[in-house]
Curated annotation (Swiss-Prot):
Keywords: Cell cycle, Cell division, Chaperone, Cytoplasm, Isomerase, Rotamase
UniProt-listed Enzyme Commission number(s): 5.2.1.8
Gene3D superfamilies: 3.10.50.40, Trigger factor ribosome-binding domain, Trigger factor, C-terminal domain
PPIase FKBP-type domain: residues covered: 162-247
Record's subcellular location: Cytoplasm
Organism: Lactobacillus helveticus (strain DPC 4571)
UniProt-recorded name of the protein: Trigger factor
Catalytic activity: [protein]-peptidylproline (omega=180) = [protein]-peptidylproline (omega=0)
Main location: cytoplasm
InterPro entries recorded: PPIase_dom_sf, PPIase_FKBP_dom, Trig_fac, Trigger_fac_C, Trigger_fac_C_sf, Trigger_fac_ribosome-bd_bac, Trigger_fac_ribosome-bd_sf, Trigger_fact/SurA_dom_sf
The protein's role, per its UniProt record: Involved in protein export. Acts as a chaperone by maintaining the newly synthesized protein in an open conformation. Functions as a peptidyl-prolyl cis-trans isomerase.
Top EC class, one word: isomerase
């Protein structure tokens, strides 16, 4: 295959390539088989025309467009690979020549990934993380579990924040009832934020049997557009007031909330270990995020093509909607429930698309520079893990994802680990002082440049 690559811009170029006569012949044969079943030629039954008769009657050129559509995708992919370019998006391909019994020549206008110049990605300074678990952390978790296991008991007297009231309510706007504005025997925890702002506050300080006229204004960004920004009156009847009775903090409580322990001390030790694990995981995530952010900041990346931004948005959208569907929610149902649409979701993902693409480009450059590879065993494990995560069989995963795609994900994670493992934790105050100094130096340099 003859392939020529000519760069016309930082992220654009022209790719000229040939499609061999042998490939064209296969494409013509396949195109003929597709059209032959619907052919009407005088003197022949429908679908029983030979290739020779077809060429005599219509000419071989009648198959060229279909044949080109058949052979072009593989020919273009092979040309991209041979040229050693990282093409993105859809190319614009035009024929240069399509002569009979000769190779065909094509010219493609191609968008390619921007050039990445790596800066320092080892030894990135990141804020030091505190993973110590304090007694107050354990106490707070115990309090939370007591709250979760509290018993609601009838309360005499006025309601307070944290109490649960059983109410009937009927809402009106300008004297007219509206859909979803009424309920009977509804249990509402005061201070939970379950209702629109102001509703729960107006029920505090009342007793069972009280009638309360609750007046609120729906938020301007309220999901139901016909209610947004409007004042509503809720005629509310309080039937019961209940307060939380917290369980006693003892061995019995410990066994009730966790059947793997026998004493309160054992529960405390278990909670402390769980909190330690959580803090260490959160610390590792924070270190990784800061280290990668530093590596990206130190790198220089040419302007990112729109095609890469759109590809990223498409990927994010498909992954998000795919997760929804795995939970049994189809896209249209999701849009209805959230009062959104596809365009709004795309706009949301587009906000950070450029940064995501830049980060991925820098990580890919690190993969290449460090010569990171994925072994067959790692690819096999990746398939097993994905099959378990998405409840799919391994064969389906293998048919859906190529080894190259899996290898890419594995090696990018290796690059992330490499950057993280080589990061240096420093005191936050020291790091902030250094960043402030760097910002000041940058500002001074810009001032000098302007005053020249």
């Amino acid at each position: 295959m003859s392939v020529k690559w000519k760069k016309t811009g930082k992220t654009t170029g022209e790719l000229t390539f040939d499609i061999s006569k042998d490939e064209i012949k296969l494409g013509l044969d396949q195109a003929f088989r597709r059209v032959k079943k619907n052919l009407h030629v005088p003197g022949f039954r429908k679908g029983h025309v030979s290739r020779v008769i077809f060429d005599q009657y219509y000419g071989e050129e009648a198959l060229y467009e279909d044949a080109l559509n058949i052979v072009l995708p593989n020919a273009y992919s092979a040309a991209v690979k041979e040229a050693g370019i990282a093409a993105v998006g859809q190319p614009q391909i035009v024929p240069v020549s399509m002569d009979k019994d000769k190779d065909w020549t094509m010219k493609a206008t191609v968008t390619v990934e921007p050039e990445v110049k790596l800066g320092d990605y080892k030894g990135i300074e990141v804020p030091k993380q505190n993973t110590r678990v304090y007694q107050k952390d354990v106490d707070a978790e115990l309090d939370k579990r007591r709250e979760q296991n509290a018993e609601l008991v009838l309360k005499k007297g006025k309601s307070a924040k944290g109490d649960t009231v059983t109410i009937d309510y009927k809402g009106t706007i300008d004297g007219k009832e509206f859909e979803g504005g009424s309920a009977e025997n509804y249990s509402l925890e005061l201070g939970s934020g379950a209702f629109i702002p102001g509703f729960e506050d107006q029920l505090i300080g009342h007793e069972a049997g009280d009638d309360v006229d609750v007046v609120v204004t729906f938020p301007k960004d309220y999901g139901a557009k016909d209610l947004a920004g409007k004042e509503a009156h809720f005629a509310t009847k309080i039937h019961e007031v209940k307060s939380k009775q917290l369980p006693k903090l003892d061995d019995e409580f410990a066994k009730d909330v966790d059947d793997s322990v026998d004493t309160l001390d054992e529960l405390k030790d278990k909670i402390k270990k769980q909190l330690k694990d959580q803090k260490e995981q959160a610390a590792n995530d924070a270190i990784q995020e800061a280290a990668i952010e530093g590596a990206v900041k130190n790198a220089t990346v040419d302007e990112i093509p729109d095609a890469m931004i759109q590809d990223d948005v498409d990927t994010q959208l498909n992954q998000y909607l795919g997760n929804m569907q795995r939970q049994g929610i189809d896209p249209q149902t999701y849009y209805k429930l959230t009062n959104t649409n596809e365009q709004q979701l795309r706009s949301q993902f587009a906000k950070n698309a450029a940064e995501r693409v830049k980060t991925n480009l820098v990580l890919e450059a690190i993969v290449e520079k460090e010569g990171l590879k994925a072994t067959k065993e790692e690819i096999d494990k990746e398939i097993k893990d994905l099959a378990a995560e998405y409840n799919m069989d391994e064969k389906t995963i293998r048919n859906t994802l190529s080894d190259d795609m899996l290898s890419h994900d594995i090696t990018v994670r290796k690059a992330m680990d490499l950057v993280t493992d080589n990061a240096k934790q420093v005191a936050k105050a020291k790091l902030e002082a250094k960043e402030a100094e760097e910002a000041e130096d940058k500002e001074e340099a810009e001032d000098k440049k302007e005053n020249k």
